[in-house]
Amino acid sequence: FQLWQKLEPQLKSQNLYELFTSTEMRLMPLLAEMEIQGIHLDSQTLYDYNKELTIGIEDIQNKIYSTVGHAFNIASPKQLQEVLFTERGLKPTKKTKTGYSTDTSVLEELALYDPVPKMILEYRELAKLQSTYVETLPSMCDKNERIHTDFIQTGTATGRLSCREPNLQNIPVRNEAGRKIRSAFTATPGTILISADYSQIELVVLAHLSQDKNMCNAFISGTDVHKATAALIFGVPQEEVTPQMRRTAKTINFGVIYGMSAFRLANDLGISRTQAAEFIENYFKTYSSVNDFINSTIQKTEETGFVQTIFGRKRHIANINSKNKLEKSGAERMAVNTPVQGSAADIVKKAMLDVSKALEEENTQAKLILQVHDELLVECPDNPQTIEKT
């Protein structure tokens, strides 16, 4: 109570009282219910997949050894440095206290020049999935074969929810391995799982904040926004957009939110930096108001020292006026990303509260059990009437 006496006037003076009371405080009991409820895990699916994954890891390992010409400890940074920079003659791009870096960003760049770094990345991804999820999740189940994650409301600076022990939000869904792991999360007998998500919510928020006509029109008309972007930046009709063009546009669409440079785009798409710079230039010609939004957000943050989400959540940006170029560019990325990602997070939190309230009022017996960024997962009794209500 003594803390509240100090904090209440501060929340009100910062115009954060409404967000705190109507969203964050109301969310706490719902998150507690979700943690208690947990989600069912079919451990046998993971046991079976572990055998398949082990074979896959061994296959990649053998390919690496065959290409290099000898066996070595792939997990050893020192041995990996020796293989890449001495034996393969690749040029180091980043130095650490223990030698040249072999982190993901370095390997992604080196993969443009040599097949081994790409294989190392594949090996690491599968090995991490195996150790973090496939081998670990079954041991985290309770007697009812349910896993209970811990949701954290204060774990991110943007307001996004995070979770731990286990982190169920980090399971990749864009590759086959991640989808196999995800398929192990199942409904218990007599129930089904219903998933609902916001389609491209961060891009929708960006369109709203920037009020860019081309981007808003794409969403309002129900057009595939990545296809529409590709058509505009490549100067072709939408029906002539190829899958490769769409992939390029999608990478740029999401990359802009996170301040992607031409260098990073070139690495992601396997193209030259000159071509990547042209794509980004064409993107901002296409969505000129997005460029205006980015510039005005940075300028305003330089003046005030903070940014806000649509709901009024604030984030102070420490190095926005730094003389250090690296610090300032990082601060600028935070300043642009936070209103977009933070607003999306606030919208999803409101949706969680609204959905939970509606399920209770309709007496459906359905329960919200998981939130993964822009997706809500509900466990629902398996009967037609309840499913329709839910």
Per-region residue spans from a language model:
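Short, polar/flexible loop-turn hinges at active-site or ligand-entry regions and domain interfaces
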Residues: L7-Y17, K213-F219, P237-V241
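Function-dense linear segments that define catalytic or interfacial modules
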Residues: F1, Q153-Q238
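Conserved catalytic core of nucleic-acid polymerases
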Residues: I36, H148-T149, Q153-T156, A231-T364, ...
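Conserved "right-hand" nucleotidyltransferase catalytic core of DNA-directed polymerases
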Residues: F1-E176, I192, S199-E202, A262, ...
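Short aromatic/hydrophobic contact patches that present stacked aromatics
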Residues: L193, N337, L377
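Extended, hydrophobic alpha-helical segments in both membrane/secreted and soluble proteins
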Residues: L27, L46, E202, H226-T229, ...
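Active-site palm subdomain of RNA-directed nucleic acid polymerases
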Residues: L11-T23, L27, I347, A351-L376
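Short, conserved charged micro-motifs
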Residues: S76, N383-K389
